[in-house]
A protein has these predicted regions:
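Active-site cores of enzymes that catalyze phosphoryl transfer or operate on phosphate-rich substrates
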Residues: 1-14, 112, 256-330
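Extended catalytic-interface subdomain
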Residues: 97-162
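A generic secondary-structure signal for well-formed alpha-helical elements
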Residues: 40-43, 57-61, 65-72, 117-121, ...
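Short acidic-aromatic active-site loops that bind/stabilize oxyanions
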Residues: 22-29, 279-286, 304-311, 338-346
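Alpha-helical packing segments of well-folded alpha/beta enzyme cores
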Residues: 32-39, 289, 345-348, 352
């Protein structure tokens, strides 16, 4: 069935008109489409929001209309749906991605939130926010990446400056010696976390660190090693930092030019500099976005409200702007900018760590723009918070970049590597004043089945009720109970559906794995090519000789079926998944695989 419902962005709107069209009430598909057209005319929406409409709904309706030799008139004034672009598959950063077809409604906006990255991150509010900044129509923007939006903003800035827009990047990387390459070709700073569980932890985060470095250190393709400034003399330091306000930054550059202070801004470690006399192109692009995001964050009342959605999509714009400085095809990119930004980020984080240690704090972990601190002097809770506030002021003054208290955690657990025992850099979970912060474990992975996700959720909920070390036994019991339910056939089969991204066609696979089995079964059942998408299936019998018999696709599963439909090999497969997921939670507390087996 299809439901056409008016959903106003204004919370005060009382218009909740709904028009439902159920295909089961129609003798043939043609009458269903005709009824749907009547519904669209009756409700007459300006914006049509679908979930996977470009990949499922509109292709199906257009196929029905084509078979019946009629039009699909869902636009205004009885105009047909327009296929502006067919689906395409391409490689992006080593990952095969499918861009779905683009179905446009004449006179209306069709936004497919199921396939829109910006829509998923910021909803309609986020799409409107970026559309205003970039000048890209909302309907087009919903099918583009943040990179396309930042490119549009850069082009607009270039046109406002009266500067020709490069057709494509035409500048090669500067020649470097082997030693210079080793020193400069590095990313942000990572410090290995101290293993185990830590209590009373403060996490400090720099706000928009990389974009703020671009703005405050005047990093842009035309400002790196400029001819108007002098290289840094050995032993001389230049601590000039440009303000985030573009007008104030322009004024600072002009005053330095008038005073003939033409010493470049030294980049740490790599021996290069940026201009101090002319405010750069990239800083003028990112500074207004940083200011706008700061304003939106100040309006936030709760996580997930409209202001949070808007600031969240601006975060992705800023992240992309940094990434584009090192992207080989970016019109306004230059790898030396990327290297300088990373060098500054390492210096700023190390300086923050040094200031923290001077104030009696111990750094237990640091990642690029975040640092985790525990008290090293036995201070009271109030003394700790006072010290943290003072420390944040020092760091902000020293760096010229705002730093924020992300959260205060009652405890945080870093997950050790299964083989080496060394804690992983990006796998941890913590419980603080703002709730849970979880990174890297199965509950955060798209491929995880609902059964595993529920088990980990229950384990984490149990840990928050008391000191984790004292209730770890109850948490272990959740693992055994989940496995018991599986073996007794009490787990719904739909909760065991796992996902795999399809990166190759069936004939390109060299190993007969579960993804290949799912593709072969889909081909046997006449399903469409899933290249670049995800396939969803349940493992029922891994020992079967024919790959197509080892799994069942999600579309084949009866909602009433349970894990009793899985044979012993399938049960063992899911038990192994449960064991690994449980160890992600329990291993920081000293629980090993031997205890759970």
């Amino acid at each position: 069935s299809v439901e056409i419902k008016i959903v106003g962005l204004d919370s005060a709107s009382n218009d909740n008109s709904t028009y439902r069209v159920d295909m089961r009430n129609h003798a043939n598909p043609t009458s269903f489409l005709q009824e749907l057209e009547k519904g669209m005319q009756a409700v007459n929406p300006d914006v049509v929001i679908t979930k996977k409409g470009d990949s499922i709904d509109f292709p199906a309706m257009m196929s029905i209309a084509s078979s019946a030799n009629i039009g699909l008139r869902l636009g205004r004034d009885g105009r047909n749906v327009v296929l502006r672009r067919k689906s395409i598959t391409n490689w992006s950063y080593g990952r095969l991605v499918k861009s779905e077809a683009y179905h446009a409604l004449q006179g209306r906006l069709h936004i497919d939130l199921g396939h829109s990255f910006i829509g998923k991150e910021g909803g309609i509010e986020g799409l409107i926010e970026i559309s205003r900044i970039s000048g890209i129509p909302v309907q087009d923007l919903s099918r583009l990446s943040p990179g396309s939006a930042i490119s549009a903003i850069q082009i607009n800035q270039s046109m406002n400056d009266g500067v020709l827009v490069p057709w494509k990047k035409n500048r090669a990387e500067d020649i470097k010696t082997g030693l210079e390459m080793v020193i400069s070709d590095r990313g942000g700073l990572y410090l290995d976390p101290l293993p185990g569980v830590h209590r009373d932890v403060f996490e400090l985060d720099f706000a928009s660190l990389f974009p703020s470095i671009i703005a405050t250190r005047n990093i842009s393709p035309e400002t790196m090693k400029c001819e108007c400034c002098k290289p840094i003399i050995s032993g001389h330091s230049n601590n000039v930092k440009f303000p985030l306000d573009p007008k104030e930054a322009e004024h600072l550059a002009m005053s330095r030019a008038l005073s003939n202070d033409n010493m470049g801004l030294m980049v740490p470690e790599i021996g290069t500099y940026s201009c101090s006399l002319k405010y750069g192109f990239l800083p003028r692009v990112v500074a207004p976005i940083i200011s706008r995001r700061r304003e939106l964050k100040s309006r936030m009342k709760r996580k997930g409200d409209e202001w949070d959605k808007r600031q969240n999509v601006l975060k992705w714009l800023l992240v992309t702007c940094f990434g584009y400085t090192g992207y080989r095809n970016a019109r306004f990119g230059r790898i030396e900018c990327h290297e300088a930004i990373c060098a500054w980020s390492r210096e700023i984080l190390l300086d923050a760590k040094g200031l923290a240690e001077e104030d009696g704090w111990r750094c237990i972990h640091a990642i690029v723009d975040s640092i985790w601190l525990v008290d090293n002097e036995g201070r009271t809770s109030e003394e700790q918070r006072s010290s943290i506030r003072s420390l944040m002021s020092k760091i902000e003054y020293n760096s010229g970049i705002r730093i924020e208290l992300e959260d205060f955690y009652k405890w945080i657990a870093f997950i050790p590597n299964k083989k080496s025992g060394i804690p992983s850099l990006t796998k941890y979970f913590a419980h603080g004043e703002k709730g849970w912060k979880i990174r890297g474990i199965e509950i955060r992975q798209h491929s995880t089945c609902n059964w595993i996700r529920k088990m980990q959720t229950d384990m984490l909920k149990n840990l928050q009720f008391g000191p984790p070390e004292k209730i770890i036994g109850q948490t272990i019991g959740i693992f055994f109970e989940s496995v018991s339910n599986l073996t007794k056939g009490e787990v719904p089969l739909m909760d065991l559906v796992i996902s795999r991204r399809v990166r190759k066609r069936p004939e390109e696979y060299r190993v007969s794995n579960l993804t290949l089995a799912a593709l072969l079964r889909g081909k046997l059942l006449g399903q469409e090519d899933l290249l670049g998408r995800k396939t969803h299936f349940v493992v029922v019998n891994r020992s079967r000789r024919e790959p197509v018999d080892r799994i069942k696709l999600r579309s084949e599963i009866n909602p009433n079926c349970s894990s009793s439909a899985i044979n012993r090999d399938g049960i063992e497969f899911y038990k192994a998944l449960a064991l690994r997921a449980s160890l992600s939670i329990l291993s920081p507390f000293g629980i090993t695989e031997d205890i759970l087996l």
